Amino acid sequence: MHPFQWCNGCFCGLGLVSTNKSCSMPPISFQDLPLNIYMVIFGTGIFVFMLSLIFCCYFISKLRNQAQSERYGYKEVVLKGDAKKLQLYGQTCAVCLEDFKGKDELGVLPCQHAFHRKCLVKWLEVRCVCPMCNKPIAGPTETSQSIGILLDELV
């Protein structure tokens, strides 16, 4: 690309240069684009790639958490508005014998018994049943190895 030719072409198009000689804009091909155009295209591509990567990571973590709760029947809640629905205010964790307080992280089992999340994890390391009613947490086909995987994911 010849910058003087390009500038003369612009000036001719604006009527700033005498028109006694033939003055026209040279055709611009993809190879003649300035370097900053390449940087804009490359930067936009990187930006879109990073947004896609962030979205995929967020979506995968949501799916992993959803699959974990469906697979093991263990639901994790924070004691806020859900506590009124589960009627947990003033109740005691059967593992540590402490009352539930605001913003406590709770684990709710399929039998609707709630415990502190840390207490439940410690309990599941020893026994794979509900501390209140002794119902099994995992289905009959689940092995103790899958419960170990559950404990690894919770911690």
Swiss-Prot record:
Arranged from A to Z, the UniProt key words for this protein are: Endoplasmic reticulum, Golgi apparatus, Membrane, Metal-binding, Transmembrane, Transmembrane helix, Zinc, Zinc-finger
- What CDD domains does the entry give? RING-H2_RNF122
Decide whether keyword Endoplasmic reticulum is in the record: yes
GO cellular component terms given for this protein: cytoplasm; endoplasmic reticulum; Golgi apparatus; membrane
- Zinc finger residue ranges, RING-type: 93-134
User: Where, by residue number, does the polypeptide cross the bilayer?
Assistant: 40-60
Name of the protein: RING finger protein 122
A Pfam family the protein falls into = zf-RING_2
